[in-house]
Amino acid sequence: METFLGIMIPFLGTALGAACVFFMKKSLGDLVQRALAGFAAGVMVAASIWSLLIPAIEQSEGMGKLSFLPAFIGFWVGVLFLLLLDHLIPHLHVGSDQAEGPKSRLGRTTMMVLAVTLHNILEGMAVGVMYAGFLAGNAQITAASALVLSLGIAIQNFPEGAIISMPLRAEGEGKGKAFFGGVLSGVVEPIGAVLTLLAAQMVIPALPYFLSFAAGAMLYVVVEELIPEMSQGKHSNIGTIFFAVGFSVMMTLDVALG
């Protein structure tokens, strides 16, 4: 039950964010979107370092001076995997007018949902890897540290849910359909978590590779998507400030509770 709840927490964050469409009349302003993107980026960077990369290196200490190698390899596989998906799946980043990936007749909103869904899969995988390590009795991964990662991702999923549902509403969709669109982007997280949990449990010795793979994928999303989002438009430091806030929140949660 503990693992099930941990896997579902990030999805709940997305759903609560998407529910903003029922309480807010106007679409999110540019300043708010930049603040939310900065906050999400800060959370993801801190989670990648403290919850994923550091445990991956610690678990490979038996390799001596080469203890960095599994983390290095897994990290690069994660980056290259996201790069491949970027080229294979048509998608549109929030605040951008230029679609990426192969040419497609998909609508703007659909491609925006695909962009968020793409990195939600990876966030689900990160949670799945953490719980796989906990269930395997790994000394570096406790129930608290796995829960901290779930909570951190849920926190940054809240604005993502709103960033999807509010533009849908602004484009004329009904509140129910806009909410469903936001929720749909987060459904893949528990699915990705369960599949990764099962795969990681079958190959526990490769856990450092799985952890660093998730870190590489998450940092790719930060640089490719969130940093441009928090920096676009009229110059403002709001994105940078909220990046620092998100980073501090996740770092504090991980060190204090993990």
Give the location of each predicted region.
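Intrinsically disordered, metal-sensing/regulatory segments
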Residues: 1-258
